Amino acid sequence: SLVKAREIPAGECLVFEGFMDFLSAVTLGVTGNADCLVLNSVANVEKAAGLLDGYGRIGCFLDRDEAGRRTLAALTMRYGERVTDRSSLYDGCKDLNEYLQLTTKKQKNNHLKIEEQ
């Protein structure tokens, strides 16, 4: 699924493995003015790849597992330096949704500690 940020084409497209990761990115505010492509499954990378042809920059927020690494490699092989791995944002987590959940949990715990004082 391609989610356009505006009527006019954006210079960057962000790629997500699943819809929950896309919604997590929106919640975290990392989508900016970029268009977003949700693969729904890494098996769809070849079908979806043609949608990325017109973008100068492709940011990948893929799962930090073997399937995510293969998908990143396939996109890098096709688009070269236009592709950027953005998964360092959620280093230590499987995916962006897990990162959001942990971040939210930490914020709640910190808020509770402040209220207790």
Task: State the predicted function of each range.
Residues 17-20, 64:
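Helix N-cap/beta->alpha junction signal
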